[in-house]
Amino acid sequence: MSTEGLIAYCRPGFEPDLAAELSHHVAIKGLPAYAKTERNSGYVMMLGAPREQINAAIAFENLIFARQKYTLIDELKNLDIQDRISPVLEALGGKGRYGDLSVEHPDSDAAKQLAGLAKAFGNALRPALRKRGLLTDKPNEKLPTLHVIFISNNHLLL
């Protein structure tokens, strides 16, 4: 089952503030979305409505606590650490083509240890995406960037 919505980064410790801010904006638009977060994680997810609707309801320039926001294609949990690429490719099937790839992690103490893994995974994922036709050969600003976010070594957000 797909988890879609929106993810927004914030400074660790400000998750409740960002969750309230995002919830306010979706409530104004009458969307049945809800915030999901963990204290000091550095991010908040908005779930419960189509990602396009949530994204349209929340203009980045109106946010105080968000550092960045992205549409959330899927959440992949309990991944086999021997093969993280296959579930990513499966989750992206039929979801469009991307002009660039960014593999990252939230700015939290717990997630900083994932920096090396994120870089190595990006180097392995990039050719697999290109082989499937999901990523252009060269960066293309006219197409969206695919953000792959490491929450832990076996938990990714797309």
Where are these regions (language model features)?
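C-terminal edge-of-domain segments
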Residues: 144-158
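N-terminal basic/disordered segments at the start of proteins
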Residues: 1, 15-16
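Non-catalytic nucleic-acid substrate-recognition regions in nucleic-acid-modifying enzymes
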Residues: 3-4, 9-11, 20-144
